[in-house]
């Protein structure tokens, strides 16, 4: 079963924000989604969920049941659009491009990168960047050829690619 989504992302916006993202992605173990939409700490330690008393999984008198999926999993899927952080980051430009003078208002910067996520693109993370005044232009493809799409500044369009017979045999 295909599990990864390949993305080509280009970001442009206020220099101070773009530089922070760029520097963070250059680190040995970058956490792009966590930087943009931080997951609350308690999601790591919340092993049980409260269920209604009539729910079939409700096994205790306290209304709590062991949850088969950890709280972080559901939170990430809802708030990041993917269960894991971005991985295998490769920059498409060698350097951060600065547009203007960093000591003056209105200075911008831009860079592009390629990465993978689990199952789909991190649309909520991209939306958060757009809300911060950052331009996001991204193309994405499912590794199994089930979908592909384009995201530009809050507008997402995805489709099923047309596959020829050879592609279908390889799937």
Descriptions of predicted regions:
Residues 1-171:
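Long, contiguous binding/interaction regions
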